[in-house]
Amino acid sequence: MIKILIDCFGGDHSPEANVDGAIAALAKMPDLHLILTGDEASLQHCLQGKTYDTQRLEIVHAPEVIGCEERPIDVIRLKKESSMIKAVRMLRDCDDINAMVSTGSTGALVAAALTRIGRVKGVIRPAFCPILPTMDGGIVGICDSGANVEITPEHLRQFAIMSSLYMKHVYNIEKPRVALLNVGKEAEKGDEIRQKAHFLLSETPEIHFVGNMESRDLLSGRYDVVVCDGFSGNVLVKTTEGTALELLKKLKKDIYSRPIYKLGALLMKRMFMEEKEFMNYQNYGGSILLGTSKTVVKGHGSSKATAVEKCIEQAYRMETSSLSSKMEEIIMRYEHYEY
């Protein structure tokens, strides 16, 4: 049985979306056991009238909620009864609990995970790796996307190793193509950090490094993993998601601007619906925090039930892949760590 904690408060649609996503995940995965943390009365209210296996879902009362504007260091110290911190403590202390999912504050989650759960042996800094769809029907992982603003070339090599293993063992991509986000494709492009990182990645046989990537090629389908610092990665992901949403809005507005466009849209309704689903980030779950000793998945703050369900599925697949041991084995081959 795979046991996963769900932090049910802190997101824009909490706790309803978290509860509905949890119930949907239970229906799909018969060997899954979920533990919901949060205000018990609110969670019981959300569960009323819902059909689910009561033997595989439990509630742990946590009356406090962490706001996105609160300082991470403060909430770890002062909000020990919050849904997030209680989930992190349980993940650390209980050997039979495998993973946790949260749609709450990113800063608080990273700080709590690093100080309370710890890292895989040899990992310098854990990193987020969200998934986006590509134009050829595949997916691409972006690592890092927000955990580390300041990085070194060695950090980028570790991000590449971790995310490459993730794409291989969780998403079944046999030989993930790894690219380095840069301002140009030539090896000498970028600042000193990127130039040194390019050399390190080229000298790392455990990954299939294919060179630099410009941001415009992110969704081209030519890459399976893109490594970068957390600031650039976060901007890249959010710009891509935002552009897709705005294009859909413009398309809808244009369709309603003329009767003939409405007629054409009616004939192409099925295609438009498929494209809308393809570009909807809710269908791709959240960001796995690679490199922590236990699995942590961070969902969008705006996650609805579908996204929460996908986050749970990510955590489940991570646990069934035994990725942490594989990650430690490769990373420990390199001795020059920068702690």
What are the residue ranges of the model-derived segments?
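N-terminal phosphate-binding or glycine-rich loops at protein starts, especially the Walker A/P-loop
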Residues: 1-44
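Short, glycine-rich nucleotide/cofactor-binding loops
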Residues: 6-16, 76, 147-157, 298-303
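Short glycine/serine/threonine-rich phosphate/pyrophosphate-binding segments
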Residues: 14-18, 81-91, 99-113, 124-129, ...
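Glycine-rich phosphate/nucleotide-binding loop
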Residues: 114-128, 134-142, 222-226, 230-339
